[in-house]
């Protein structure tokens, strides 16, 4: 938002340097991005009166103009297409100075294509007044030739960024009000002096609010016999300094009042409004409407429109229509000032992809009790710059009352929160400076009436924030109030999540955070995630189709992470995410906390002596087994449940004490192809509540062995359909304390073996921690285990 200092000074007396004003506003919560001084990029530039124009004899695109400075006539060669007889424009005579790319240069006599030129006719951009460069400046015909241009355009412009809660500051008056509160300088409001005459407005126009929920107040005036044309210089200068383009005197007045008082207005051509009736209604589904920017919009029945007796003439709070636009032919106008619900305006603006200065202000909230004063201010200015007859009275339909909110604010609470010792009088002064009426209860509380333009103040803590702003954050003592933290212990699941997080970070994994919302595109990529279609939870009012479904797994979001990074040439992607998944179980909506682990890329950094190896199933399995060991889970079981998400032979589901905790594996190649990803993706997902339930955290620390152990190998043939985990489980069920460990040494598959069989070699390590183990004892124990396992798999195992 651009705020000209000269305009600001019309409402508050400020004898401060721009840097001081910027600091005051910043400390009050308005973010001043900076300020610039305009009109100082030139000197000696004056108003020139173009007396004659003829074509250049030696150049098709050049003109020869005779320009008066009020005393003498100068011949100037100009290339602007809008140079014409009778135009008042910016004239830099010989000796004037301009600045180009930071360097000053003086205007000198010269020749262009053989014709002498004594000066330069300037655009606003060349004078660094604005960025408009569509021709030389067109000044008011009422200006005297020879008038110094810097008296009209020199100014300081503040660039202010407003947060959404500061809608009441989105105007010149709003910023002046903040400065008044911070400096105690009195605020002057705009004058309202005009004359009503002519017919009673009820004889010229009727008003009907059908959509009462979306529009709770609508006011309008009729002004007849206006003369639409160019705006006077003072009006045009203020509009352009504030970053808007001058259109005509009627439109410029509505923009002027928007900038000045912060409330959007709109003017309709009265003679183009059918039935002389204004109807505030919802659009019809599929209704087509051409907005002022020349684009046709397809409306929905959730869009609020202003209509006449036949058709829409404006999208309420967003933009007017071509079919009622004020033009040079307009002689009678309807001037609108209304209060539209911020939610309706925001939805309409987003759905149509159409954001305007008006919609931004309506979305932040405007003051419904300001409508009449805003309307009258605009009517007064229109009468001043365009003439016309303001018809008697105002059409004003209101569907509800807008009362000031009364909030109890305790003095003790103010000092407790801020760590201050403010007196009652100091707080009263602050409330008065803010324009808040109040009553003191004689003990500790103020009953504060909040003006309706302060939509951001809703409860006591908001009033305390206002006190802090005006008192000054830099005046609040650093040793503020002391507070005791909650004595309630953290939730066990939260502590468990933190433990998992710390371990996985220590493993060298990055933490990812993805969105809970996904779209059909990702769902189609992943297809079946062990979750039926009826379990998917859809969002009723999604902001976009790609955020219309709550995720049933962390995989879709993490696949997006892989795709994005590979597209940006980042091939090493190892990380995890702790988040929530959502699904529907019958009529109940369920939410679960899960951890997802993802590996993609190479297991070791590049080395010239070693061949690069991609992450595989066993890399992921190793991380998971280490995590389980960290959690004290000693006997995990892995089963292949043939989940469609994973490669059929490179997956496993994790069971602990018959409880399925999660699954992991290599993401199915078909998913990789749909993502257009060439490198392997490993993924695992585990239910945190289930993991916490089976975690014991009772780590058994074994001392280093002081007695030697003994090893035995066993090679046997077994069906490939028997999971290795089942064999290990059978051994552990029969083992004694002498068996320290069992390792898989080798798996051999060959056409020479019986179809569907493989050779497997296991190494058994025996040790007695109290003495040297006898070989006879080892042999007996080894034979016992071999016999037990052989009997267990009698139909599947051959020795």
Curated annotation (Swiss-Prot):
What does the UniProt cofactor note say? Binds 2 magnesium ions per tetramer.
- Report the locations given in the UniProt record: Cytoplasm
B5 domain sequence ranges: 402-478
Q: Which InterPro entries match?
A: aa-tRNA-synth_II/BPL/LPL, B3/B4_tRNA-bd, DNA-bd_dom_put_sf, Fdx_antiC-bd, Fdx_antiC-bd_sf, NA-bd_OB-fold, Phe-tRNA-ligase_IIc_bsu, Phe-tRNA-ligase_IIc_bsu_bact
Q: What is its EC number?
A: 6.1.1.20
Q: Which reaction does it catalyse?
A: tRNA(Phe) + L-phenylalanine + ATP = L-phenylalanyl-tRNA(Phe) + AMP + diphosphate + H(+)
Where does the record place the tRNA-binding domain? 39-150
User: In which residues is Mg(2+) bound?
Assistant: 456, 462, 465-466
Q: Which Pfam families match?
A: B3_4, B5, FDX-ACB, tRNA_bind, tRNA_synthFbeta
Q: Which cofactor does it need?
A: Mg(2+)
Biological process per Gene Ontology, one example term: phenylalanyl-tRNA aminoacylation
Got a GO cellular component term for this one? phenylalanine-tRNA ligase complex
Q: Which GO terms describe its molecular function?
A: ATP binding; magnesium ion binding; phenylalanine-tRNA ligase activity; tRNA binding
Keyword terms, alphabetized: Aminoacyl-tRNA synthetase, ATP-binding, Cytoplasm, Ligase, Magnesium, Metal-binding, Nucleotide-binding, Protein biosynthesis, RNA-binding, tRNA-binding
What range(s) does the FDX-ACB domain occupy?
Answer: 705-798
What binding partners and quaternary form does the record give?
A: Tetramer of two alpha and two beta subunits.
* Similarity remark: Belongs to the phenylalanyl-tRNA synthetase beta subunit family. Type 1 subfamily.
Name recorded for this polypeptide? Phenylalanine--tRNA ligase beta subunit
* Encoding gene, per UniProt annotation: pheT
């Amino acid at each position: 938002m651009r705020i000209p200092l000269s305009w600001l000074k019309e409402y508050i007396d400020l004898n401060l340097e721009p840097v001081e004003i910027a600091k005051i506003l910043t400390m009050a919560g308005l973010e001043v991005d900076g300020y610039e001084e305009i009109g100082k990029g030139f000197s000696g530039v004056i108003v020139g009166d173009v007396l004659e124009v003829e074509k250049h004899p030696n150049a098709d695109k050049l003109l020869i103009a005779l320009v008066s400075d009020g005393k003498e006539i100068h011949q100037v060669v100009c290339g602007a297409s809008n140079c014409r007889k009778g135009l008042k424009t910016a004239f830099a005579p010989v000796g004037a100075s301009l600045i180009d790319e930071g360097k000053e240069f003086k205007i000198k006599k010269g020749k262009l294509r053989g014709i002498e030129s004594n000066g330069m006719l300037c655009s606003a951009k060349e004078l660094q007044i604005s960025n408009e460069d569509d021709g030389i400046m067109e000044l008011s015909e009422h200006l005297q030739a020879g008038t110094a241009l810097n008296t009209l355009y020199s100014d300081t412009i503040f660039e202010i960024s407003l947060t959404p809660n500061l809608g009441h500051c989105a105007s010149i008056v709003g910023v002046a009000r903040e400065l008044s509160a911070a400096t105690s300088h009195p605020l002057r409001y705009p004058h309202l002096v005009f004359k009503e005459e002519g017919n009673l407005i009820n004889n010229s126009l009727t008003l009907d609010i059908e959509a009462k929920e979306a529009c709770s107040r609508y006011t309008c005036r009729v002004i007849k016999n206006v003369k639409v044309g160019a705006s006077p210089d003072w009006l045009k200068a203020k509009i352009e300094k504030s970053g808007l383009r001058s259109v005509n005197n009627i439109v410029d007045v509505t923009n002027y009042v928007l900038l000045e008082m912060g409330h959007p207005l709109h003017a309709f051509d009265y003679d183009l409004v059918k039935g002389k009736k204004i109807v505030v209604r919802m659009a019809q589904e599929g209704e087509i409407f051409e907005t002022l920017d020349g684009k046709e919009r397809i409306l929905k029945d959730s869009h609020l429109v202003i209509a006449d007796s036949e058709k829409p003439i404006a999208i309420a709070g967003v933009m007017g229509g071509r079919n009622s636009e004020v033009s040079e032919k307009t002689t009678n106008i309807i001037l609108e000032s209304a209060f539209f619900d911020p939610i309706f305006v925001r939805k309409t603006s987003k759905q149509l992809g159409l954001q305007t200065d008006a919609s931004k202000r309506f979305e932040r909230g405007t003051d419904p009790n300001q409508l009449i004063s805003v309307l009258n201010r605009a009517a007064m200015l229109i009468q001043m710059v365009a003439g016309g007859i303001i018809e008697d009275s105002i059409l004003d339909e209101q569907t509800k009352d807008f009362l000031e909110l009364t909030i109890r604010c305790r003095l003790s609470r103010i000092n407790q929160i801020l760590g201050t010792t403010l007196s009652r009088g100091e707080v009263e002064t602050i409330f008065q400076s803010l324009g808040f009426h109040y009553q003191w209860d004689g003990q500790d509380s103020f009953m504060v009436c909040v003006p309706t333009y302060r939509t951001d103040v809703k409860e006591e803590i908001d009033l305390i924030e206002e006190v802090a702003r005006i008192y000054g954050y830099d005046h609040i003592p650093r040793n503020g109030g002391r507070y005791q933290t909650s004595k309630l212990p953290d939730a066990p699941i939260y502590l468990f999540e933190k433990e998992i997080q710390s371990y996985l970070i220590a493993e060298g994994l990055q933490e990812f955070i993805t969105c809970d919302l996904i779209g059909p595109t990702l769902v189609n990529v992943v297809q079946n995630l062990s979750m039926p279609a009826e379990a998917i939870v859809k969002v009723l009012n999604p902001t976009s189709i790609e955020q219309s479904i709550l995720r049933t797994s962390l995989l879709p979001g993490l696949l997006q992470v892989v795709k994005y990074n590979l597209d940006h040439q980042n091939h090493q992607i190892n990380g995890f995410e702790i988040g929530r998944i959502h699904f529907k179980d019958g009529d109940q909506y369920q939410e679960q906390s899960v951890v997802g682990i993802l590996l993609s890329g190479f297991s070791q950094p590049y080395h010239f002596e070693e061949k690069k190896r991609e992450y595989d199933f066993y890399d992921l399995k190793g991380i998971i087994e280490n995590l389980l060991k960290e959690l004290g889970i000693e006997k995990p079981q892995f089963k292949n449940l043939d989940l469609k998400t994973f490669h059929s032979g490179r997956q496993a589901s994790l069971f602990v004490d018959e409880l399925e905790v999660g699954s992991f594996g290599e993401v199915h190649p078909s998913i990789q192809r749909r993502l257009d990803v060439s490198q392997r993706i490993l993924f695992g997902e585990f239910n945190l509540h289930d993991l916490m339930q089976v975690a014991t955290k009772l780590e058994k620390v074994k001392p280093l062995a002081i007695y030697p152990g003994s090893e035995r190998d066993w090679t046997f043939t077994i069906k490939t359909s028997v999971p290795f985990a089942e064999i290990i489980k059978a051994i552990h069920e029969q083992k004694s304390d002498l068996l320290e460990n069992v390792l898989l040494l080798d798996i051999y598959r060959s056409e020479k073996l019986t179809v569907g069989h493989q050779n497997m070699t296991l190494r058994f390590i025996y040790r007695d921690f109290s003495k040297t183990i006898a070989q006879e004892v080892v042999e007996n124990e080894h034979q016992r285990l071999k016999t037990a396992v052989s009997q267990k798999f009698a139909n599947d195992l051959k020795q």
